[in-house]
């Protein structure tokens, strides 16, 4: 068995019926010629008779109240693989409604925590694969890599593969900090979380120093280098979920146009997309008579995976990033966000990997504290979670079926009701919006505002757009 590290454990301890902590993503394929009726059943049969590699063969085993491990088992593929078909005409609206419904329920902890749905009967002879995986089992970048690994760049490859079949690599040994109380670390008191950072293994000498440094910044005893919790202004986006219902939306921007804009302004693709998101959020607030006079703050996970990207679990740090001023012009907003992300990266480079993970745990805990305690709920740590993942740039296939669409269904975090995740897929930059309806009940409008923000940024920066963006709302 493999002991579960604190970040992975937090996704289990924080999960509630109204706040699932699984990730989900779907891929849509155009069925190969001559296989319109047979491709789905063949895929279902192959998946039901497949074997799962790590981490998809890991089942949760509790060793105590706040201690858990992954136990290697042989999954019951009959349970994990489901096949369903949409009734005619199989419209995209029907598909999105089905996906939203399937993504609502919690994953069964009596099995390895993942499910796969083959969704047949989509208009224009298409078929989809929806994968749900618990965030404790794998992080977003690892999940995207798993989705990439089961696809081929050759239309002649006839292998009926699934994301769980190819091993994600042997789990690297990771030291596990001393057990921290569930109540103190994850649901209760900020003081308990800070003390928890000092209880790491004795060999990790730099972590305590980093924790003390953060504390000194919080007390204004030295200049701030890190963004600290409980400093964001509460907005509509901090209305938390009352049920498991979620609202989703999707935006696709031409990747070439995004890269051209980043190059012309001396920034990055990440900065450009954050600017588009930030501008859209401020306009959404204004439309709902809920404008803020301070910059919005983004909670940004940052991958600590090495280039091989192997292994399950979560290998991430995080940072709180203040974005642009509410009234800033598009280019001014981009410059402000570029400066903020540069500071975040510079700070991260100066911290040990373990220190960065401990800092991420502190920030994650601060979101939970704000969600649980009314007083601190008025001073949230962040207004939105924004994640950037790198996807494939080449055309991919599943047994000769070309990939035509991809979208994630982001987790809605504690303390904030909105999560925006983006990834580059082929020639598109796909932005996925996941929200509690209490925070964003019109994801389609937010998607439209992102499209408009991108066009306005291009216009002010002096770049042209030979292509157009698209938006969808499940």
Swiss-Prot record:
Optimum pH is 6.5-7.2. It catalyses: an acyl-CoA + a 1,2-diacyl-sn-glycerol = a triacyl-sn-glycerol + CoA; di-(9Z)-octadecenoylglycerol + (9Z)-octadecenoyl-CoA = 1,2,3-tri-(9Z-octadecenoyl)-glycerol + CoA. Keywords: Acyltransferase, Glycerol metabolism, Lipid biosynthesis, Lipid metabolism, Transferase. Pathway: Glycerolipid metabolism; triacylglycerol biosynthesis. The active site is at residue 135. One of its GO terms (biological process) is response to acidic pH. Induction: Expression is controlled by VirS. Induced at acidic pH and in macrophages. Induced by low levels of nitric oxide (NO), but not by hypoxia. InterPro entries: Acyl_transf_WS/DGAT, O-acyltransferase_WSD1-like, O-acyltransferase_WSD1_C, O-acyltransferase_WSD1_N. Pfam families: WS_DGAT_C, WS_DGAT_cat. Signal peptide: none annotated. Transmembrane segments: none annotated. One of its GO terms (cellular component) is plasma membrane. Disulfide bonds: none annotated. Belongs to the long-chain O-acyltransferase family. Required for maintaining the appropriate mycolic acid composition and permeability of the envelope on its exposure to acidic pH. Upon expression in E.coli functions as a triacylglycerol synthase, making triacylglycerol (TG) from diolein and long-chain fatty acyl-CoA. Has very weak wax synthase activity, incorporating palmityl alcohol into wax esters in the presence of palmitoyl-CoA. This is Probable diacyglycerol O-acyltransferase Tgs4. It comes from Mycobacterium tuberculosis (strain ATCC 25618 / H37Rv).
């Amino acid at each position: 068995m493999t002991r579960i590290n604190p970040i992975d454990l937090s996704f289990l301890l924080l999960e509630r019926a109204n706040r699932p902590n699984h990730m989900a993503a779907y891929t849509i394929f155009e069925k190969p010629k001559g296989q319109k009726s047979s491709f789905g059943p063949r895929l279902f049969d192959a998946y039901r008779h497949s074997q799962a590699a790590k981490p998809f063969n890991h089942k949760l085993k509790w060793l105590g109240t706040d201690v858990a491990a992954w136990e290697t088992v042989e999954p019951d593929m009959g349970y994990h693989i489901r096949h369903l078909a949409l009734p005619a005409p199989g419209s995209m609206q029907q598909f999105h409604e089905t996906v939203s419904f399937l993504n609502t329920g919690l994953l069964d902890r009596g099995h390895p925590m993942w499910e796969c749905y083959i969704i047949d009967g989509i208009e224009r002879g298409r078929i989809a694969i929806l994968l749900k995986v618990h965030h404790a089992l794998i992080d977003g970048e690892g999940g995207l890599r798993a989705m990439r690994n089961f696809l081929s760049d050759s239309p002649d490859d006839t292998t009926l593969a699934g994301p769980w079949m190819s091993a994600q690599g042997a789990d690297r040994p990771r030291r596990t900090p001393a057990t921290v109380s569930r109540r103190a670390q994850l649901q209760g008191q900020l003081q308990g979380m800070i003390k928890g950072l000092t209880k790491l293994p004795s060999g990790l000498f730099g972590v305590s120093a980093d924790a003390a440094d953060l504390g000194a910044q919080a007390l204004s005893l030295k200049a701030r280098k890190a963004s600290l919790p409980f400093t964001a202004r509460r907005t509509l986006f901090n209305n938390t979920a009352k049920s498991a219902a979620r609202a989703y939306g999707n935006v696709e921007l031409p990747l070439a146009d995004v890269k051209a804009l980043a190059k012309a302004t001396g920034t990055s693709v990440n900065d450009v997309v954050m600017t588009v998101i930030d501008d859209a959020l401020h306009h959404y607030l204004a439309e709902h008579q809920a404008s803020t006079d301070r910059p919005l703050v983004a909670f940004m996970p940052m991958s600590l995976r090495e280039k091989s990207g192997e292994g399950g679990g979560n290998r991430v740090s995080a940072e709180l990033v203040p974005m642009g001023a509410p009234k800033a012009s598009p280019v001014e907003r981009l410059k402000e966000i570029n400066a903020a992300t540069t500071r975040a990266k510079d700070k991260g480079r100066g911290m040990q990997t373990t220190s960065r993970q401990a800092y991420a745990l502190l920030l994650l805990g601060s979101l939970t504290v704000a969600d649980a305690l009314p007083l601190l709920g008025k001073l949230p740590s962040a207004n939105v979670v924004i994640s950037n993942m790198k996807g494939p740039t080449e055309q991919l296939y599943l047994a000769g079926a070309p990939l035509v669409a991809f979208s994630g269904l982001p987790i809605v975090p504690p303390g904030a009701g909105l999560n925006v995740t983006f990834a580059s897929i082929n020639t598109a930059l796909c932005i996925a919006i996941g929200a509690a309806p209490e925070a964003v009940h019109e994801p389609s409008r937010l998607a439209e505002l992102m499209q408009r923000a991108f066009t306005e940024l291009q216009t002010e920066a002096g770049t042209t757009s030979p292509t157009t963006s698209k938006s969808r709302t499940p």
